[in-house]
Amino acid sequence: LLSNNIIPDLVITFDPHPSRVIRWFGDLQLNEKSIKKDDYFARQDLEIMFNNELKMNSKIIKLFNKFSKKIKIAIGTSSSKKVVKRLMSTQADLYWWNPLLDDPKMNNSVSKKIYKINKLPMINTGGNVGATAWMLADALFNCKKIAMIGMDFAYYLDTPIKSTQYYDRLKKFTKEEDLKLFYTKIYNPNLKKFFYTDHVYAWYKKCMME
């Protein structure tokens, strides 16, 4: 959006990953060594421009620095230290909130304990930032029509398994021959086409439907 001079009304972030999410705001410490440690952006199919990682990161740093004073960000307290440090060093307006981690009515609720410390509002995220955006648009901003773009929760059939979102994590505790058990074929009646999904995306969809 920023590369086309489009300023979003609100940016949402809360993913705690220590090194990946920062890339959407520009990682000031990114180098060849850190890239070799994590092949996520090299193998994923979400944005092919990220394949040239150093060049794209440099572009994002410049774009975000240029437009940050016009950007409002709803930042979850679960965000990584890198993201927090980066955003607080810019001119972006930050609006803090707590991701709902469990039922706050429970006696030993972690969400309740965190709220007592910082007194920030709690939001049911649905497990991903797209669902969070939908919930904010619906419950907070009372939007009557909400369009969801890029929330496929699935992959095209010709997408290599190694390009899927959670492949690297699966490899750590699953044998190569058993990886296929984590994926399932699904049918989209609107597009009249088959796709495939993984158990995490399937859970995200279930949460959205509920």
Protein language model regions, located:
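Metal-ion/cofactor- or nucleotide/acyl-coenzyme-handling active-site neighborhoods
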Residues: 2-210
